[in-house]
Amino acid sequence: MPTQREEDEAKIRQQVDKIVGGIRAKDLEGLKRLYATDVVSFDVEPPLQHVGIEAKLKNWARAFTFFQDVDYEVRDLTVTVGDDVAFGHAFGRLSGTLRDGTATNGMWVRGTFCFRKLDRNWLIVHDQASVPFDIASGKGVTDLEP
């Protein structure tokens, strides 16, 4: 019989799978159900932070405008679970077909998800996506692969 932590980890992994499905479907309403209303997101594009669910969804909606078809992949997800707080980290890649028909492989980012158990549901209260940067040039390094 699985422990409570094992059950919670399975639920969190299901939430991450739902993120992938929501992105692929460009389903803002589906994505909205996965985040706390007061989510704080540190994404790869400005500003430094997106505060609140509306800001997070606006950021996703903007990203979706670039794609005719969009794909999202998560690799090497590691999850650590507490009683009502959990975090996970992984590599993620947004790719697909741009509006002009050009296929893009996208770029791999480092991602962190912080979850809180609210009303028996694991919701994302913070997420972060980043790329390493070259200290000498100050530019992000976007061609690395896991």
Per-segment meaning from a language model:
Residues S95-T97, F133-D134:
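Sequence/structural signature of outer-membrane beta-barrel proteins
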